[in-house]
């Protein structure tokens, strides 16, 4: 009798083992994993939310330059959004030798894309431009960022544009400014590619064409409200010499530290998604404008010490 009881207990324990095994494989989510940047991107009445990519309270932020979530056109790749609901200052249009409209100099061409090929996290953005066979990956820092562009076909090229401003190019470096609306405020750009272009043109739009055998172009840039030199310093301080994976890990850690200040208990995953997405939205404001101990004030158009 005792033997039968032992066998029965052993059998039941054997049946429970798979449950413990599967339970041990359950992924534990960090706070940033609950954030859904697409929540609210389609609005029935007011302006929708935008899937903003940035670090908490940072000066540099971007979101895809499209009409709405369902649009199939991008107004170039974004560089910096200068207001809560404004367009991006500057734009980057990657192209290859098969993109005829861009190749022939249409500076305002849209980029066709499919939102199913897009991935957005608070600290990361990627999109595959299937019509051009170009894969785009992006990660921001506080005042600078990195684009990794993989050209799977044709000769790689870039159009870098500024409306109401000017840009200059020296080998693999692009720098200049764009006026913000009708105000005296300027946003400055300093940009470097890790591949020296074969051919360049400058003006309101810079054209860069690269060797056909260089299929990956890493593009690092800094922005500033003070000067081009300060934009360069911001880039060198934050992203120079760092790759996409390193910056992605750093951004994820920063977001987890910020969102993790509030811990949520409960079994409702949807409620956690709503909470942490809402908390992520609050970090769009206020914005830290300090650049190496100084900041530009739009009230008097002067640079002040912190």
Locate each region found by the language model.
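Bacterial N-terminal signal peptides that target proteins for export
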Residues: 2-13
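Aromatic (phenylalanine/tyrosine) cluster motif
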Residues: 11-14, 20-22
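Bacterial Sec-dependent signal peptides at the C-terminal "C-region" and cleavage site
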Residues: 19-29
């Amino acid at each position: 009798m005792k033997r039968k009881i032992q066998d029965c207990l052993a059998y039941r324990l054997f049946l429970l083992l798979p449950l413990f095994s599967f339970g041990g494989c359950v992924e534990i989510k960090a706070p940033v994993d609950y954030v859904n940047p697409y929540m609210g991107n389609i609005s029935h009445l007011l302006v929708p939310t935008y899937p903003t990519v940035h670090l908490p309270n940072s000066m540099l932020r971007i979101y895809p330059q499209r009409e709405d979530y369902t649009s199939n056109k991008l107004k170039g790749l974004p560089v910096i959004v200068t207001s809560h609901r404004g367009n991006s200052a500057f734009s980057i249009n990657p192209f290859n030798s098969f993109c005829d409209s861009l190749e022939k100099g249409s500076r305002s061409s849209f980029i066709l894309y499919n939102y199913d090929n897009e991935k957005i996290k608070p600290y990361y953005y990627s999109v595959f431009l299937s019509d051009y066979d170009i894969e785009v990956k992006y990660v921001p820092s506080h005042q600078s960022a990195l684009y990794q562009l993989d050209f799977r076909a044709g000769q790689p090229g870039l159009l870098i544009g500024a409306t109401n401003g000017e840009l200059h190019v020296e080998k693999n470096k692009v720098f200049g400014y764009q006026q913000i609306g009708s105000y005296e405020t300027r946003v400055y750009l300093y940009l470097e590619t890790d591949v020296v272009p074969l051919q360049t043109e400058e003006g309101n739009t810079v054209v860069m064409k690269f060797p056909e055998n260089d299929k990956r172009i890493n593009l690092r840039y800094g922005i500033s409200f003070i000067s081009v030199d300060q934009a360069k310093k911001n880039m060198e301080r934050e992203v120079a010499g760092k790759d996409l994976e390193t910056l992605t890990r750093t951004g994820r850690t920063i977001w987890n530290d910020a969102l993790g200040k509030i811990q949520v208990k409960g079994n409702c995953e949807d409620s956690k998604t709503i909470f942490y997405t809402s908390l992520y939205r609050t970090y769009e404001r206020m914005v830290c404008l300090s650049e190496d101990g100084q900041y530009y004030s739009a009230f008097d158009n002067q640079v002040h010490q912190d």
